[in-house]
């Protein structure tokens, strides 16, 4: 019975290389074989095979296994056996192994069981209250199997084959009998999506010295004594070997998934000994074979290769060259002399190349400090003027003066100078001015002491312990400095600097990390008692490009670290995105490519989604056939019917752009026919295609209704002849129809072709209406199944159809544009032919999205030198910003740059990020994530008037020391408060409890997060100019599951919540932002620019207008009256008319203005009437309009000119604008 049914919906496959057994070529295809007849049938989707097993489990007897409410919930097979044994005749079908998706309960033929039964013990992998329970083995037909495994635990079938072969020399068939097989009985051996599975132990390592481990699933230390299983070739030419250990391990790590997904692995070769068990074809696993899509159907504008990036190199020159060289020489001599003082007791003190040796041995860690000090000495001369060429000459002369005799060291020094050569002179000078000049000691003296102490630490550490690594040898710490027992004067001037504020009496000492307030009884105070530097006005944390961190001094220009030093005055340790242990940066071109493709991403996801929907149709049609023809489960049949119908409705309701993309996927040859046959007659007759200057193809119009009918017939019908007839509805020219009828070999098409041509419009209208109104799509499929009855009924119904003429609105007028756009995406990105991007049953959204991006975007750039996991982390960080903004390109790019700018501790933007949005859209998670990465001060208060709700002194100091100031759920604030915190000038003097007053340079940037609209009293242009608005209206919802395509979630604006997702993003986001900081700085300022990124974004302009109309009567008035300045306006508007329209517009203010506006202004008693209701003074509003549009107002004639606006009540904008994204 099963044999007869399967032939109707499963493709027959031959025994050739495409479908060769043991050859892993497709992770989704499953082949079943009839051992009696040799027939092989293909399940194109694992989901179809699962549905097949679920349906036949109860052997056509009532509900399926899934919906049988009376079935036992135990993990054993006995209930199924007992129930099915009464009705089963048995079959001969087995499944050929596919280790990507097939896991089993262990089983073995009876003839082999006697060999292994004494040696099998699974209790090492499971705990049970019943000893021996997991090892219980029972007979089923010709087999023995272990039934008592947990539901989500399995055995890799490939691993089971290898285990039996390696341990016992047993070779088992690469097939698994299907439930109700004659030789097995009513036992289901298959396990889908196990949490863990047993496998032989594997280790994949490169053949480098030392080798790099790419994959392991156990803890054995593999060596040459272990057997090889696979040899893998990598993109950079490296060879990796996968070794196998015959012992079992229990893990969730699938080796085949790893090698399939790693874009740096290109070929996998099985060693000859195990070719009979498994072969892996990586190319076939990754790409569909039938991908010969003709992308040259239309001329594409973006066919040129990217031009190489060219950066001009300026030549070094200076009118002050002699002065620069002299100061360099004097400075180097002074630094050398003071280093000698520190190392006086060491034999290295006599080394004439002491400074050079220090730099080389320390790997130039603090070489930049020498640049800063010598430049500060140069610029102290008021007669010294300079430009970029002078700076370049200074850097080159400095390197040459130090390393003239050492070419390798010279090249390294010049390399260290490269970042500074890219900066403008103001930026370079600003960086050097970070170095504080303690005028009680000459700059070269203190730097010489600093270098000398550092070198002495190295010499001491290396003499004591030879096994320390480089960083440990050069660790510039409090403990290491103290252990040297150097003279106090040297130590205090070179490292432990002490400061005293003579105004407040506060003492601070550099503690090896940052400056801390000390008291007389503290050890640091006593250590520096006689070496105090007194200041009357000292500001801390006044830094931009260099600042103290837990890893040392961070340099924004080089994205690297120097040793901690006392010459940067800081009382806090800001966090940075770079860590000393990070891998090297991706190439700049590769990173910029990531950001540049952001604009294409929605189109990429949309194009993929079209293909995904078509595959789903195919899968659901097969499932529908399975549940209808092979089972009797009403629930399954209803579920499949609804699922297929929902998908049909989604396809039927596609917009024009998506319809054209769908047509390309479903029937690209017909689309090519449209392009050719709907051109003008001269172009159709031209052999080579369109005439060079003819643009007729841009005027091609397609009847939307006809196209929808054709696409549904192709997708939900299975008859080529009927499809050929229906596609004739697209074409109106008789030549095409007659040619089709001549070329066809179908009598059916010839019989009805003239009818379709003659009744063209009627047929379109009738079929469109029929399909549109059909209740369930399976009813349409039934109609298509009997084409002759379908045509008979169609002729009868069309005969009664009235004549119809289609309107212009029935056409897809932008056919060519949509077609060209779709082809452009398909030309650039392999979204329809890559198998790896297909969603897997175990995928969640972040996992799938990362894999998709790695394959479609990152595979297009050369990143062979980088590990797959490192690349994946950077991609995950990038995709976080995309998901958070619902893939809004402009908002995502701006937030990336804003977040990266937090690592530059100065508020240069004068902008506050305002994030209103729906609850559950991820706003809180955004600042919680940033809290892991930077110093964030968060203050929750719904009202900041500037006069109340002030924070405590400790919190004020915390805020001044922070990198990000976040206010959650701020409902109202004053104009003065907002400008104060969003402005760049934020110096302030504050003190912690029981500590003295200190002056700080506040460097935080402001973030406001709200669910409800914010009210700012006295809202004006200054307030408006300080806002960057990112609105979010999507939601992360518990009940939403990953739909297999991110575009589905983008459309619905509902995303699944993944537990612990944000915590796992800390490192990926940090690594990604480190790249933004490295490559996206403005060379003019050295800053990461973010405030102008939304300047031309239409959505941001709209959202800014929404905020303004909600807060300001003036902006509300401008919006309601639709006032616009237009140079060519011919009419003028008198002052009386303006006042009249203001009077009308004011009546709508209550709908536009924030509720807090009236309350606040009534309290201030501005324009308030005795009835305690707020009244707007129309004369005041008129004057505000005059001020706002002063360039369009003639004071002499009292008229407005070059302006358009609503001149009557009906033209007013009375619809309140809402935020959009």
From Swiss-Prot:
Residues 967-981 bind DNA. Its main location: host cell. It catalyses: ATP + H2O = ADP + phosphate + H(+). A motif (Nuclear localization signal) lies at residues 692-701. The keyword Transcription does not apply. InterPro entries: DNA_helicase_Baculovir, P-loop_NTPase. GO terms for biological process: DNA replication; viral genome replication. ATP binds at residues 917-924. It holds the Pfam family Baculo_helicase. It is found in: Host nucleus. One of its GO terms (molecular function) is DNA helicase activity. One of its GO terms (cellular component) is nuclear viral factory. Its EC number is 3.6.4.12. The keyword Protease does not apply. Keywords: ATP-binding, DNA replication, DNA-binding, Early protein, Helicase, Host nucleus, Hydrolase, Nucleotide-binding. Coiled coil: none annotated. Interacts with IE1 and LEF-3. Essential for initiation of viral DNA replication, it may contribute to other functions such as controlling the switch to the late phase and leading to the inhibition of host protein synthesis. Required for late and very late gene expression. This is DNA replication helicase. The lineage of its organism: Viruses, Viruses incertae sedis, Naldaviricetes, Lefavirales, Baculoviridae. The gene is HELI.
């Amino acid at each position: 019975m099963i044999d007869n049914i399967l032939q109707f919906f499963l493709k027959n496959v031959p025994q050739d290389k495409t479908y060769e057994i043991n050859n892993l070529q497709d992770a989704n295809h499953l082949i079943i074989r009839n051992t009696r007849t040799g027939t092989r049938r293909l399940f194109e989707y694992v989901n179809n095979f699962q549905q097949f097993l679920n349906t036949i489990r109860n052997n056509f007897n009532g509900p399926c296994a899934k919906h049988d409410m009376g079935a036992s919930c135990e993990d054993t097979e006995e209930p199924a056996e007992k129930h099915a044994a009464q009705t089963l005749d048995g079959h001969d079908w087995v499944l050929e192994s596919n280790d990507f998706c097939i896991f089993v309960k262990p089983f073995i033929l009876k003839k082999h069981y006697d060999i292994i039964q004494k040696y099998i013990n699974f209790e090492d992998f499971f705990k049970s209250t019943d000893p021996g329970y997991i090892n219980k083995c029972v007979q089923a037909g010709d087999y023995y199997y272990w039934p008592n495994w947990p539901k989500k635990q399995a055995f890799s079938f490939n691993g089971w084959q290898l285990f039996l072969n390696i341990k016992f020399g047993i070779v088992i068939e690469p097939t698994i009998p299907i439930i109700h097989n004659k030789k097995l009985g009513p036992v289901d051996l298959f396990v889908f999506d196990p949490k863990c599975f047993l496998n032989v132990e594997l280790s994949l390592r490169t053949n480098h010295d030392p080798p790099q481990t790419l994959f392991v699933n156990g803890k054995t230390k593999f060596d040459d004594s272990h057997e090889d299983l696979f040899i893998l070739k990598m993109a950079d030419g490296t060879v990796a070997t996968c070794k196998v250990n015959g012992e079992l391990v229990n893990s969730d790590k699938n080796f085949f998934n790893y090698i399939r997904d790693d874009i740096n692995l290109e070929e996998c070769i099985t060693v000859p000994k195990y070719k009979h068990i498994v072969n892996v074809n990586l190319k076939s696993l990754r790409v569909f074979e039938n991908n010969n899509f003709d992308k040259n159907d239309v001329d594409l504008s973006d066919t040129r290769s990217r031009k190489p990036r060219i950066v001009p190199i300026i030549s070094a020159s200076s009118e002050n060259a002699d002065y620069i060289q002299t100061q360099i020489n004097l400075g180097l001599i002074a630094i050398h002399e003071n280093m000698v003082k520190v190392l006086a007791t060491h034999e290295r003190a006599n080394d004439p190349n002491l400074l050079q040796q220090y730099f080389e041995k320390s790997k130039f860690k603090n070489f930049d400090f020498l640049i800063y000090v010598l430049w500060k000495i140069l610029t102290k001369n008021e007669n010294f003027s300079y430009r970029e060429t002078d700076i370049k000459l200074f850097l080159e002369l400095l390197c040459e003066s130090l390393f003239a005799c050492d070419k390798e060291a010279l090249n390294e020094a010049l390399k260290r100078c490269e970042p500074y050569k890219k900066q403008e002179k103001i930026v370079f000078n600003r960086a050097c001015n970070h170095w504080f000049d303690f005028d009680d000691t000459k700059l070269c003296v203190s730097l010489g002491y600093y270098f000398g102490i550092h070198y002495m630490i190295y010499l001491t550490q290396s003499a004591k312990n030879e096994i320390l690594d480089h960083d440990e040898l050069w660790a510039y710490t409090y403990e290491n400095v103290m252990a040297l027992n150097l003279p106090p004067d040297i130590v205090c001037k070179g490292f432990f600097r002490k400061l005293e504020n003579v105004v407040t009496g506060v003492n601070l000492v550099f503690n090896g990390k940052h400056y801390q307030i000390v008291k007389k009884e503290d050890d640091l105070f006593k250590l520096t008692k006689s070496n105090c530097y007194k200041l009357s006005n000292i500001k801390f944390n006044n830094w931009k490009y260099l600042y103290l961190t837990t890893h040392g001094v961070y340099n924004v220009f080089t994205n690297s670290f120097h040793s901690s030093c006392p010459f940067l005055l800081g009382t806090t340790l800001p966090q940075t995105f770079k860590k000393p242990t990070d891998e090297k940066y991706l190439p700049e071109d590769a990173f910029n490519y990531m950001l540049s493709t952001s604009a294409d991403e929605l189109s990429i996801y949309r194009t993929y989604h079209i293909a995904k929907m078509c595959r789903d149709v195919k899968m659901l049609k097969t499932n529908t056939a399975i549940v209808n023809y092979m089972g009797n489960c009403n629930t399954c049949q209803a579920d499949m019917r609804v699922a297929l119908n929902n998908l049909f409705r989604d396809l039927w309701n596609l917009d024009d752009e998506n319809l054209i993309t769908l047509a390309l996927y479903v029937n690209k040859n017909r689309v090519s026919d449209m392009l050719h046959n709907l051109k003008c007659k001269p172009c159709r007759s031209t052999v080579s295609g369109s005439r060079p200057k003819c643009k007729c193809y841009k005027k091609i119009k397609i009847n939307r209704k006809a196209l929808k009918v054709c696409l549904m017939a192709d997708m939900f019908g299975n008859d080529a002849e009927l499809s050929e007839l229906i596609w004739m509805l697209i074409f109106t020219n008789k030549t095409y129809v007659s040619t089709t009828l001549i070329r066809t070999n179908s009598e059916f098409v010839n019989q009805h072709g003239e009818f379709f041509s003659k009744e063209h419009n009627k047929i379109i209208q009738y079929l469109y209406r029929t399909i549109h109104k059909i209740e369930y799509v399976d009813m349409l499929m039934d109609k298509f199944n009997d084409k002759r009855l379908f045509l008979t009924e169609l002729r009868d119904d069309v005969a009664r159809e009235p004549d119809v003429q289609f309107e212009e609105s029935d056409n897809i007028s932008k056919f060519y544009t949509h077609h060209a756009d779709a082809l452009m995406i398909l030309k650039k990105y392999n979204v329809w032919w890559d198998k790896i991007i297909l969603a897997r049953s175990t995928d969640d959204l972040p996992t799938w999205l990362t894999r998709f991006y790695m394959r479609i975007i990152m595979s297009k750039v050369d990143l062979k030198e980088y590990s797959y996991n490192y690349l994946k982390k950077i991609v995950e960080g990038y995709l976080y910003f995309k998901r958070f903004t619902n893939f809004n390109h402009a908002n995502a790019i701006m937030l990336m740059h804003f977040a990266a700018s937090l690592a530059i501790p100065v508020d240069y933007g004068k902008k506050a990020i305002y994030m209103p949005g729906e609850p559950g859209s991820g706003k809180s998670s955004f600042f919680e994530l940033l809290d892991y990465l930077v110093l964030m001060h968060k203050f929750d208060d719904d009202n900041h008037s500037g006069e109340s709700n002030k924070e405590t002194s400790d919190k004020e100091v915390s805020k001044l020391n922070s990198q990000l100031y976040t206010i959650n759920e701020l409902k109202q604030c004053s104009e003065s408060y907002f400008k104060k915190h969003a402005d760049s000038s934020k110096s302030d003097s504050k003190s912690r409890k029981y500590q003295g007053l200190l002056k700080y340079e506040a460097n935080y940037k402001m973030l406001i997060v709200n669910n409800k609209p914010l009210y700012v009293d006295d809202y004006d242009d200054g307030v408006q100019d300080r806002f960057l608005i990112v609105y979010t209206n999507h939601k992360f919802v518990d009940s939403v599951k990953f739909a297999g395509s991110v575009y589905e979630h983008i459309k619905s604006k509902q995303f699944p919540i993944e537990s612990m997702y944000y915590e796992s993003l800390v490192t990926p986001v940090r690594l990604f932002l480190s790249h933004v900081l490295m490559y996206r700085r403005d060379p003019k300022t050295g800053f990461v620019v973010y405030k102008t990124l939304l300047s031309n974004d239409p959505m941001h302009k709209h959202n800014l207008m929404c905020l303004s109309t909600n807060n300001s009567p003036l902006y509300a008035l401008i919006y309601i009256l639709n006032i616009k300045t237009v140079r060519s306006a011919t009419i003028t508007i008198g002052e009386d008319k303006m006042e009249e329209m203001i009077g009308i517009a004011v009546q709508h203010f209550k709908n536009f203005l924030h509720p807090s506006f009236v309350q606040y202004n009534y309290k201030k008693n501005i324009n308030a009437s005795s009835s305690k209701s707020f009244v707007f003074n129309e004369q005041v509003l008129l004057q505000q309009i005059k001020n706002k549009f002063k360039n369009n107002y003639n004071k002499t004639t009292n008229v407005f000119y070059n302006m358009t606006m609503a001149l009557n009540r009906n033209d007013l904008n009375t619809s309140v604008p809402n935020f959009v994204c």
